[in-house]
Amino acid sequence: MLFRSVFTMGDNHKPANIAKAAIEHAQKNGNNLVILDTAGRLHIDEDMMAELEEIKNTVTVHQTILVIDAMTGQDAVNVAKEFDEKIGVDGVIVTKLDGDTRGGAALSVKAVTGKPILYVGMGEKLSDLEQFYPDRMANRILGMGDVLSLIEKAEAELDIDEDKAKERDRKSVV
């Protein structure tokens, strides 16, 4: 199981102190993975950037992943560039690609930062996080659609329906 608990200290604490306490809490409880999720930003906010720098200076961070909203368009490039310059980004997740956004910002972010796009968000659930495939994104941007992802989703649904049918058949024999 990936998520065991959520650590919180409330709103009246500095983010760096919360990060430090969260890691200490995880270590005491035998957790070997801590995800520090900070406040979202659609534009550069100097105070929030300073908070991120303070977190990186307070705790040992093994990987920094920037989550970009595809609907912000080309402004995502400015955000990604600033984040990478200020705190260093190891990879990118692009969200909200389930709408009518084509995702051109994703490739621009990759070009500007040189950092890999790790995943794309195709909905609001954790299960809607999909591995990033550059060729599929290129087809989407060119208006050709993402036929392979559509086929994979259909196959997954067929597998689920087949499993349900087998279970139903098994129960009817009893």
PLM regions: where:
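Short glycine-rich anion-binding loops that position phosphate/pyrophosphate groups of nucleotides
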Residues: 39-41
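Active-site-adjacent beta->alpha loops and helix N-cap segments on the catalytic face
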Residues: 49
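Active-site beta3 strand of CheY-like receiver
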Residues: 35
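Conserved phosphate-handling catalytic cores of large alpha/beta enzymes
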Residues: 19-23, 27, 31, 43, ...
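Conserved donor nucleotide-binding strand/loop of the catalytic core
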Residues: 5-11
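Short, acidic/glycine-rich phosphate-metal binding loop used to engage nucleotide
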Residues: 11-13, 70
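Short, small-residue-biased leader/transition segments that mark boundaries at the very start
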Residues: 1-2
